[in-house]
Amino acid sequence: MQLLNNWYSLLLTEVAAYFTSTTLFVSILKNAPSLSWLMKYGGHDNFGLKPPLIATKLEVPKRWFWHFYAFISLLNPLFTFFILNTNFPIPIFKNIKEDLMYSKKLQVLLLIYEIHTLRRLYENLRFRKSGSKMLAGHYLLGYLFYTHTFLALLLCGRRSYENTMSSMQFVGLGIYAIGSIWQNASHEHLIAQKNHSQYLVLKKGCFKWITGPHYLGEIIVYTGIALIAQHWLIWLVLGWVLCNMVAISSSYACTVKNKEQSLDFRWTLIPFLY
């Protein structure tokens, strides 16, 4: 039991440290103009700043985003199947198996996260015409983020064996569904834009009021997941998502403004706030 507790504490500390440190790092970079090139998101303007030459040599196609979603969409069910169909005497594996079998909360979280990543995989595969580039570091961070989020979901389900979901968890499930529908609708507009030979001004749906509604959709999805999980570790995940979406939506808004040359006011990410 002591070994199990040590492993749990170590994993909990590592995952918490990852999300805390990366969130702080992104926050610092966003407020450090000379380092803002590290935040350069494929296809977005970098507020007029050019990255060092070596950074341009360490870029990969932005369409490789689909690799993250394929990876986590396979990891989730394969890990679950592996744990449920093996009988390792190692305490930590036995405990995870019990959680997967008896924690309704964990079962729901892994299911909706699988649905989310499969949807994002489908959308990204349809986005593969993009010729934009992203920093190789962002590519590696993608794998780290989804791996750590998966670990966070497993950790928050430890010995959480409630038979029924609370009213707040049902609210979270509804928010997750709204966020998924919102984000998918936004991505469909973006996919339609990509299929045009010339830049298409997006003014339909949520794009009437918000420059980057697809980024807001990501925040809504993870807010729903956090309400279902009801664990402080998932709130750290949401904090990372919020910080990252604010940074990305800022550069995206700059890109859209330069391409559209429009005087119409739209919120960047969150209506009435930003």
Swiss-Prot record:
GO cellular component: endoplasmic reticulum; endoplasmic reticulum membrane
Pfam families documented for this protein: Steroid_dh
TM ranges: 9-29, 64-84, 135-155, 165-185, 219-239
GO molecular function per UniProt: polyprenol reductase activity
GO biological process terms, semicolon-separated: dolichol biosynthetic process; dolichol-linked oligosaccharide biosynthetic process
Principal subcellular localization: endoplasmic reticulum
Stated family: Belongs to the steroid 5-alpha reductase family.
Cell compartments where the protein resides: Endoplasmic reticulum membrane
UniProt keywords, alphabetically: Endoplasmic reticulum, Membrane, Transmembrane, Transmembrane helix
Protein name: Uncharacterized protein C7D4.09c
Membrane topology value: Multi-pass membrane protein
